Amino acid sequence: MEATSQQFMSQSYLNAQETTTRATKNYLTSLHSTRKQPSKPLKRPAISSPLNPMHPHVYRVEPVNFKVLVQRLTGAPEHETVQAKPLKTSDDAAKQSSSSFAFDPSSSWGDFSFQNPANISRW
């Protein structure tokens, strides 16, 4: 009976070892495998050509004006020159505001006596 149980134990042990060995082998071979090429190459849909193919524009130019034409075609687009309105400076604003304050009797801004350094020290 002992011989049968030992043989059974050793057989189950060998089967377990064989299973782990196969699993390890499969794992190692998967690490070293390369990706197979697809059986059929992928075909991309062909881009249909337009019904009316575009023809390049042909410029007829004198050799003297060639440089000007090339610069005009390859250069930056020309911008329209728009004159900017002059900015109001603080001097202009002060002139406008001082005249309005001078004629407004209810405005306290018309009194410029507080700008004197002697008057500032009293505050």
UniProtKB/Swiss-Prot annotation:
Predominant place of localization: nucleus
Lineage: Eukaryota, Viridiplantae, Streptophyta, Embryophyta, Tracheophyta
UniProt entry tagged with the keyword Lyase: no
Origin species: Arabidopsis thaliana
Residue ranges of the region described as Disordered: 24-55, 77-123
GO biological process: cellular response to hypoxia; flower development
Biased composition (Basic and acidic residues): 77-94
Keyword Nucleus appears in the UniProt entry: yes
Misc: Plants over-expressing VQ29 have delayed flowering.
Bias kind Basic residues: ranges: 33-43
Motif (VQ): 66-75
Name used for this protein in its record: VQ motif-containing protein 29
Comp. bias (Polar residues): 109-123
Role noted for this protein: May function as negative regulator of flowering transition.
Ranges of biased composition (kind: Low complexity): 97-108
Protein localization: Nucleus
